[in-house]
C-alpha cells in the first residue's frame, strides 16, 4: 500500500513538471524574461503601410501564408525607416486561431517589443496557416529563419 501511495504521489508531481525547453526548435521553448531582439540593418516601411513582412530572411510587402513569416509593425503609416536598434522583449506568447473553420488554422507567436530610441513600435507577430491536423505551434528556430540576418536574439540568462 505504501508503494502504491508513493507511486501515485510521484505521478502527481511529475504531472506538475513544466514542459518548458531551452531547445529553440522545440514547440515548448520559453523566451527567458529580459531577452532582446536586435535589428542589425535598416528596415524600410513603404508609403501608406504600417508594417513590413520578413520571410526566409527577406523583407517583403506581403508573404506566403503557408510559410512562417514575421510582421514588424509600427503605429503610423510610412514611409518610415526603422534604424538598427535593440528591442526589449516584454512579452512572448503562442496562439492559434481558426481562419476558415474547419479547413485552416493560424499558428503564431507574438513578441511585445519596447525600444528606448524609436516610438510607435507594435508587437511583432510571427506565424503561418495550415490544416488543423497538420499544424503546430511556431518554433523559435522558425522565427529566426524568417528574420534572417536582419534580426538576432539575445537571450537573457
At which residue positions do the language-model features occur?
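Bacterial signal peptide processing site
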Residues: 17-20
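Post-signal-peptide N-terminal segment of Sec-exported extracytoplasmic proteins
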Residues: 35-64
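N-terminal post-signal-peptidase region of extra-cytosolic proteins
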Residues: 65-77
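Short coil-to-beta-strand transition motifs
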Residues: 75-90
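Bacterial N-terminal signal peptides
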Residues: 5-14
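Extracytoplasmic
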Residues: 32-34, 82-86, 106-108
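Short, conserved beta-turn/loop elements at beta-strand boundaries and strand-helix junctions
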Residues: 91-100
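C-terminal partner/receptor-binding element of secreted or periplasmic proteins
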Residues: 117-157
